[in-house]
Amino acid sequence: MAAQHKRAAEVGAAVLEAGGDALDAAVATSFAIGVVEPWMSGLAAGGCMQIWRAGEARAHTVDYGMRSPRGLDPADYPLAQGGKAQDLFAWPLVKDDRNVQGATAVAVPGVVAGMELAHKRFGRVAWRELVAPAAALAREGMLLDWYAGLMIASNARALSRDPDAAALFLEDGQWPPLISWTAVTEKHLDQRKLSHTLETIAKEGPKALYGGDVGRALAKDIRDKGGSLSLEDLAGYQAHMVDALEVPYRGGRVFAAPGMTGGPTLAVALNNLQKKERPGYVDYARALDAAWRERFQTMGDKEGCTTHFSVVDRAGNLCSVTQTLLSVFGSRVVSPSTGIPLNNGIMWFDPEPGKPNSLAPGKRCLGNYCPVVGETPKGARFALGASGGRKILGTVLQLSSFMIDHGASLEEAFHRPRIDMSGEGRVIADRALPREVIDELNRFLPTATVRRGIFPYAFAVPAGVLREREMNMGCTEIMSPWGDAVAEKEMR
């Protein structure tokens, strides 16, 4: 089990050790990661899951992306005079950042419905047992170590604007938690309300959120703060399971999500790479540049701040899961009744009217998440994905190519230098690349070099697993202070 937080990975690995399926482990990890990494995902998230069923030799996609509330009025998001938004991407500025921050930015979440749909189809372990570990983690409260302090401090000003977010994440409602440089920290977030919410969802099932008491309290909190999400929006939400988008690639295969995700754009990029025998970094940049151009012309341009985890079980079933609140800390709003940090999915829409992706009521969001499962020419199967908004696509492309085209192991692929080409007319390259590669990239597009670091991330943050000759392995971003892969035997 490979995830962006070891505690969440341990939850999934424990499910595997107890005899659960990869899908069971994915569901348990989905709930757990929202507790221990609350700025990335949680019960208010949306996302997508790729599933490989070894017995069927077939890939499935579960799409649980967000939707705009049906009662949303685009007139409530007037454009400000001049300027561009300062968050994840340069939309025209909306008055008071109503599409970015606050309850007006909250979209209908889908992650709980997505987990329910996948669990009903493939799960073996009881729903309550899969949600219970997350409730226990929330009862304990997320440990406030140096990295948590860094993430909260970097968003403290925005969090302070919502009294409930400030009460949860900030000391005295205004200061980021101060972590001692030398002492072992014993500080924890007070997530008892979230724990109670998770206990209710464990006992009553997803209906508690989608039409029940949890949903009723959540919708009231959002409306009391000025948002438009209603209980009817929650009750009417549906996740969808469809066949995955299959991309044959040089003797191997990559399965991605169709529709309003990064999957179709990844397929374009992979098909562009087919023309090169052993593609290099300039080939990656060219393939990504062409794919982004097509995406911008046909689908729009979106970003996000997400989390990703991947799992493989002893039978060879794989799951690759990406879920997100969109921005870091989402809308920077917390529901006081439920303890749920809320998304800002409305920012996924273009605030200018008359565009293909313009803001409208009851509309699906277009995301960049791109979880995949794949197969190398030698028959090894992998599941991987990443967090990082636009950076996700290039990372998934390169990691897949490293393994399929260059025969790299999972560990080797994750340690190799990468580039980022996110459709902005420039390339960001790892400074560890040879000078001649940098020069060649510069001849194609202006290229800046950066050192791979902990914060901020210049590249996406991947997590992946691989099964080869009945041996399972996992790996996470090498610079991540929290990410880790955990084997089920470690939980014995």
In which residue ranges do the predicted regions lie?
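Short beta-strand scaffold segments in enzyme catalytic cores
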Residues: 41-53, 307-312, 371-373, 459-467, ...
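Noncatalytic scaffold domains of N-terminal-nucleophile
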Residues: 1-10, 14, 22-204, 209-211, ...
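Glycine-rich phosphate/pyrophosphate-binding beta-alpha loops
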Residues: 255-263, 310, 322-333, 366, ...
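Short, small/polar residue-rich loop motifs at catalytic or cofactor-binding pockets
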Residues: 241, 303-306, 367-369
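Active-site rim segments in enzyme catalytic domains, especially the processed small/beta chain
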Residues: 36-39, 46-68, 85, 228-230, ...
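Extended C-terminal subregions enriched in glycine
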Residues: 281, 301, 315-317, 363, ...
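Internal maturation/activation junctions in enzymes
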Residues: 164, 270-325, 334-338, 344-345, ...
